[in-house]
Structure formats: structure tokens, C-alpha cells
Amino acid sequence: MANGWTGNILRVNLTTGNITLEDSSKFKSFVGGMGFGYKIMYDEVPPGTKPFDEANKLVFATGPLTGSGAPCSSRVNITSLSTFTKGNLVVDAHMGGFFAAQMKFAGYDVIIIEGKAKSPVWLKIKDDKVSLEKADFLWGKGTRATTEEICRLTSPETCVAAIGQAGENLVPLSGMLNSRNHSGGAGTGAIMGSKNLKAIAVEGTKGVNIADRQEMKRLNDYMMTELIGANNNHVVPSTPQSWAEYSDPKSRWTARKGLFWGAAEGGPIETGEIPPGNQNTVGFRTYKSVFDLGPAAEKYTVKMSGCHSCPIRCMTQMNIPRVKEFGVPSTGGNTCVANFVHTTIFPNGPKDFEDKDDGRVIGNLVGLNLFDDYGLWCNYGQLHRDFTYCYSKGVFKRVLPAEEYAEIHWDQLEAGDVNFIKDFYYRLAHRVGELSHLADGSYAIAERWNLGEEYWGYAKNKLWSPFGYPVHHANEASAQVGSIVNCMFNRDCMTHTHINFIGSGLPLKLQREVAKELFGSEDAYDETKNYTPINDAKIKYAKWSLLRVCLHNAVTLCNWVWPMTVSPLKSRNYRGDLALEAKFFKAITGEEMTQEKLDLAAERIFTLHRACTVKLMQTKDMRNEHDLICSWVFDKDPQIPVFTEGTDKMDRDDMHASLTMFYKEMGWDPQLGCPTRETLQRLGLEDIAADLAAHNLLPV
């Protein structure tokens, strides 16, 4: 596999110290990334394995587009067993930054970590030179200091994925950080900690071979000038502008006249109006600090940054000198939930310092710097919602020992004092006291603290599944489509295919026209909170959403931007190009490829995930044992009938029918929701079919 892929799997056994090289071409039908991860986990991790067992694996896998220069392609898929949900099933973390590109430049499609080191180590990779190094001097340090120490020992060009104290202490809600603020969550930090692996440091100098460089450049120019929008591929500006036919205040295309990077080096830089067509100004479109935190963030924003080979630049970079008062660096940044979640625990809001709402900006920079340095992970905000629930409902007063409860500064919490965040995160990362169990995850605290149905059924807490993971663009995002999507994985679904389309900013009429072209009927697309019962077009929409996220996690593209469903250009009638992944695939690998072939590969990967879940759960009955939804989704808004304007609640009978229709569309058993032998064979998964049959896990 000379083009796109490197052809190499690096296997590191921490128990024996053996480091070996394998051929990744044996997994080629699974494309890369997520596909490689699931196949390795299915083959090598038996049912009954626990997350912290030596038998568990940690699989870092990239795809053929990563490292090629394709836009938004620096993603690595990290697959292991969940530390934080019921059943400890297979899950993925999705990490951006520069780690994935450096993996490819060093010559590896996959890194498999197995076993457990006797004492702390870090993995050093410089092209073909790979070694395990002692990490005793790093143990106890945060992710930032660990990265700095390793870069001093190696090179400033080294990319380090490191855990902090949370991972060392096996905190289930922990992750790893690379390139300062780019995280891989889903408990993978604790998996590394359980293996005594402090960090993986990689530097590559080889590059990625591209079959057709001229076509690659043409596709890049085409995407950058005609197709790409802003963060989440929103394709209209958030304010009316001279060049734009449409605008939408919810759009992440936030650039406008009078909006500045207020703390830029050399003086403020105006984002201005950024019409499509000029690829050199795409990076000004998205302004996440103001979008996430409000106008008070403008004067502290240095610039937007982002991942390797990404023009969108969705990562805020801020400089707030006064945060040093709280013992953290004055600079930092992130995007989305990580930008704003930290001050949500304050029942009366954060306390302002000098300007209106600056408490939210300052408090969140303090919070995210601490959170990232400790290597904590918020489970898409669920950690903080669980805190709010337990505080407001008196759970902490009931379950914390009296001495511990008395020593916590609840007065700081009520006052919106940032010092409370410091103490709270320290306790979580160092597992101090009963409160620290909050970071065990929702399922664990519900069991440990006997929270009962009130907890699971509380709408504001946003728990989607009784397995202990939250909503991630679910019933509020295209009704049954988002609801089906949220049922399918073993953590929050991390699927943005459908929400990017919904949030594009285009008017409803245009979106429904596009839906008809893609899914056969305008009825695939409902206006938000004005839903209709399930239909065949919605099922096709749900399947497409899931297959595209699996495809992106296999070729390793960013599903926050891809696919190019719509365009910002009126001259294209705002139509995108859903064959673009296949066009890049062909240009990079040299292999003939179509949209349909890639969709089939994605279906193979998605069905393998389902088979892996069946095997680990040791049950065929996915409908009644896995695809479960918390009661609030059906019981919210009791005064508004379902399928009435003004509510996004779902109907139980309609969701039952939706799942049945979706199972049929996937070729799974329509009652059980598990893959059939026929479908597994159609997808080239004969070995999986034989294994499931041997364990009586195929439907009759």
C-alpha cells in the first residue's frame, strides 16, 4: 500500500517490552481508523475483559487521507473498552491536533498498545526508531509539563499525547492531550494509566505518498473555493452581509465587520466580511471564543487555531493575564463544550471581575487549563450536569461523609468563585474523597449513590441511555434521525453528519429540496420542534448519517466539517458534493473509488461495530438490551401532544417502529436488531458470522 496508507502496524507489548511491525494491508477492507480499531478489538479482546485488564488493547489508527494534506484530515481514532459506561463495551475516542499526521509521517497506520509495564514508561517514536523509555520522572506531572519535558529530550517537532494525574489515578472520565489542547477522551487516559504508559511521543519525517498530486491540488482548490463553509460546515454568515443571500444568527460563520481578534499580536485584527471563493481567508470565518462565550471574549482572543491540515481553525486561543492569579498559564484555548462547560456548575453564574460577563470567560479559561492539564474528560458535559443534579437535589449532602462535606467551600460555589473549580478538579483528578466518584461516570454514580429513576428521567440532565452516556444531537436534531443515531454506539454518538446539515443556515425550503435529492422525499427533513411520524426517507437519512461518520472515522476526516452536503455558493444553488471523499480517496491512493463503494465500506465497519457489541454483551437482543432511551425523551413537555409544534419529545410506539425500519434498512434482524448471517456475508464478514454462530449470537 504505497499511496495513502503506510502499510505498517506498530505493536507495542508493554509487559514484555517487545516492539514489532506488522502489515496493515490485511485490514484493507476496513479502510483505516475506526475500521482497523474494531477489527483488532474484535479479534484480540475476548468477552469478559475489563478496561484495566492487561488483555485490553488501546488501538490508535489513522486512515489513508490523514497526512496527505486533504483538508480537515488530522484525526486519529482511538479504540478500547469503555471505562465509564455499563458493560465496558467497545468505544472510540477521536483526537485531532497533530498526532495523527505525525503518526503517518513516521510510517504507521496503527499503533497497538497491549500489556502493562512494570513501572511508568513513555513510548518514543522517531520514524523507524521506536523505544520504551523510563517515565518515573514524568509520573505525577500534568499533560503540559510532560509534553515540555519530552520535547526537551527529543525535538520541538515531536508531538506528544500524554495523560495527566487523572489518567495515572485511573479516573474513568479521563483522556489524553496532544498539541496542548487537543484531547482524546472516552476514558482512554485511564487505560493508558492502567498500563503505566505516561505518553506516546512521535516525530515523523517521511511524508505520505500521493498517487496524483495535480488532482489532489485541484480537489483542494475546488473544496476550498466552492464547498467548504465554517465550523460544522455552516454555509451562511451569522449576520446579514453584502455578499450573502441568507444569514442565520445560529451559524458558526461568525466573521463580520467590527468583530476583532482583540488580543492579536501587533494589535487587533478585524475578521470582516469573508465571502466564499478566497481560500486564504477561510480561517477567519469561525470565531469560537465569541460564539461559545459571548462578546466579553473578544478582547482576550489572540487568534483561532486548529489541527494539522485544517483551514477552519475552530480552536480558540486566548490570553488573559489575570488567570495567573489562579495558578494557571494566562494562555490557552479549546472549542465547543470544553470552552464553556466549566462555569456551568455555578448555580448563580460565575462572578464577574471587571466587565459584564468576563467571569464566564475568565472562569472557563482557568477551568479548561486545569481540566486539560489534569487530563480529565467531561463526557460531553455530563460530568458537570451530574454535579449540578447532585448539588441541587441534595445528593452530595446525603452521600458525602460529614467531614468531607464540611470542608468543601460550597459558599464559593454559590458565589461563582473560580477557586471552587480549582478545588473541584483537584479532587476529581487525585480521587480525593467521595465527591471524586462523580468522575466514575453516570452509570457508576447512579448505582453507587442509589439515584433511581428520578435521575435517569430528569430532562435537564440530558442522559440519553441507561448505559450512562448523554445526548449528542439526538431528538432535538431531526427527531427520529438523531434518536436512532444516538442509540447505535456505546457512548455519546459523536456524529455530526445530520446536525451539520440541520445547522447549515439555509432556509427550510432549500434544506427540504436537498433532503429530497438525497433521501427520496422532502419528508425526510422536519422543522425543529415540528416533527412528523417516521417514514422511509427519515430512515435513509439516519443510515446516511451513521455511515458517513463511520466513513470519516475510517479515512480519518473531521466529521465536524465533512461531508460537503451543502455549499455557500448561490451559483451552485447551495448544493455540495457528497462524492468528494471518494474523489480525494482516488487521488491519494490511486485506487478507483466511488461514493457507493465507500458507503459500502462504511456499512461494513458499522456492522462490525454492532457485531463487536453483540459479542461483548453476549446477547442477540440489541433492541431490548442495548438500544434503550431514557424516559424523559418521551415524557417531557407533558402539556404538548407528540408531533405537535413546540416540542421535540418522541413517541414510544413511533420509536419502536423507527428502530424496526432501521434494522431492516441495515439488513439486521428486524426484531432483535443484531446482524444476520446473510448481511455479514454480503459485507465480506464471513469470519465474524462464523464466530458469532459458534457462540449462538446469530438470529435464527
Where are these regions (language model features)?
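Extended catalytic cores of very large enzyme megasubunits
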Residues: 4, 19-20, 24, 65-72, ...
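Structured core elements
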Residues: 8-13, 20, 59, 102, ...
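Extended C-terminal regions of large enzymes
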Residues: 53, 74-76, 151-186, 192-700
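Short, basic, helix/turn surface patches
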Residues: 126-148, 404-413, 698-700
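Feature captures the catalytic cores and cofactor-binding loops of soluble hydro-lyases/lyases
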Residues: 39-122, 130-133, 137-147
